[in-house]
């Protein structure tokens, strides 16, 4: 048996290069023109970027091709996301939204009606969405923490409760809300135009603020239930695997770009008569970053490959998200130190990445929760408490 090696397929390499050129030639110049105080790309500029991205086939990257998306597998997506995140406003969405927002992956379990009412408009019309799991009572343990309720009332459900730390809710067209029913946790599609739904921003350290979502007896059609009652946590597990993989890939892309900035700086700056690139302490920082980035990349690729082959990738996705977000934050911190005062300046994206990656270590599974999850998987029954 001949080992075929680790080279990416030519088509995937070409796609990665295409995304990289779009970021360098289209996206970064748009961001640079906004000035250091900007926190997002204005809607009119974003519309132009979206049109150009769509003409290149870079639209709703992981949405199935049969519905009009790019149809990327999990592996293809994480490879591409590395390049798609090498710019200033790469959170909460790679490309600052230039590539559209794919429908929540759970919707594909909802049947033909949900496909027509929500999936196709998301891709065709550029609708945006949110996913609401976390609540004030907790986010890492949804089976116990979710207190939002959904009561059946004839052909409708009535949802009541509060969700916290929700991305996109203030400007989305709809969202997937997880609520407690008689059969357990269930997933519902809630349009933001429904009476009784309101949002408010929660200021945090990064530029993009999450929101609090209040559901005050919000009535939705029973047809907006995704799957069956009680299937919500199973549906959320698939969403979390994909979400954790994308966080890992984005952290790797940012870390790699931060190292590129450091290498460029070290090659042109001198202290006490010698280039920074000759300083052993700084050399070791770059060496450690290069090793960690490569390790994180392979960890993420393995997890994505496992997900694509239909295997349970929850453990590997947790490992990838934990390792890559931690290393991404550490690498950006080190590069800021290498650049000194310039590392803090808003003229370059390091300080924004620093804040974004600090948040990334908390959302979609805190680093501590992921370590506990990994430990339980590795230790097996020995990890369970005994009386």
Language-model features, listed with the residues they occupy:
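Glycine-rich phosphate/pyrophosphate-binding beta-alpha loops
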Residues: 139, 164-170, 359-366
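Flexible, small-/acidic-enriched active-site or ligand-binding loops
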Residues: 145, 193-221
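A short, charged helix-loop
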Residues: 211-238
């Amino acid at each position: 048996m001949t080992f075929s090696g680790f080279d990416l397929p030519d088509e995937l390499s070409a796609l990665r290069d295409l995304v990289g050129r779009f970021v360098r030639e289209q996206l970064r110049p748009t961001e640079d023109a906004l000035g250091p105080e900007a926190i997002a790309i204005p809607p009119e500029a974003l519309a132009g970027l979206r049109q150009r991205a769509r003409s290149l086939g870079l639209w709703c990257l992981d949405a199935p091709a049969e519905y009009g998306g790019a149809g990327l597998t999990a592996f293809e997506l994480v490879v591409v996301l590395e390049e798609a995140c090498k710019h200033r406003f790469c959170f909460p969405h790679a490309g600052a939204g230039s590539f559209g927002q794919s429908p929540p992956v759970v919707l594909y379990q909802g049947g033909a009606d949900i496909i027509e009412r929500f999936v196709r408009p998301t891709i065709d019309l550029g609708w945006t969405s949110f996913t609401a799991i976390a609540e004030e009572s907790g986010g890492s343990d949804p089976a116990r923490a979710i207190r939002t309720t959904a009561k059946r009332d004839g052909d409708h459900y009535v949802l009541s409760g509060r969700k916290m730390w929700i991305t996109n809710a203030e400007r989305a067209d709809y969202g997937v809300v997880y609520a407690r029913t008689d059969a357990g946790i269930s997933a519902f599609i809630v349009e933001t135009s429904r009476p009784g739904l309101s949002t408010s921003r929660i200021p945090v350290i990064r530029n993009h603020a999450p929101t609090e979502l209040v559901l005050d007896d919000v009535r939705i059609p029973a047809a907006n239930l995704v799957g069956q009652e009680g299937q919500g946590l199973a549906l959320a597990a698939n969403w979390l695997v994909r979400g954790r993989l994308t966080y890992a890939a984005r952290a790797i892309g940012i870390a790699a770009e931060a190292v590129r900035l450091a290498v460029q700086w070290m090659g042109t700056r001198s202290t006490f008569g010698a280039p920074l690139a000759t300083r052993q302490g700084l050399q070791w920082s770059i060496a450690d970053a290069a090793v960690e980035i490569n390790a994180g990349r392979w960890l993420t690729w393995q997890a994505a490959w496992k997900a694509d082959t239909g295997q349970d990738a929850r453990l590997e996705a947790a490992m990838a998200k934990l390792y890559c977000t931690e290393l991404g934050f550490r690498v950006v911190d080190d590069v800021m130190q290498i650049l000194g005062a310039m590392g803090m300046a808003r003229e370059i994206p390091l300080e924004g990445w620093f804040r974004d990656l600090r948040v990334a270590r908390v959302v979609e599974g805190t680093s501590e929760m992921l370590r506990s999850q990994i430990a339980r998987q590795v230790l097996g029954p020995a990890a369970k408490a005994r009386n």
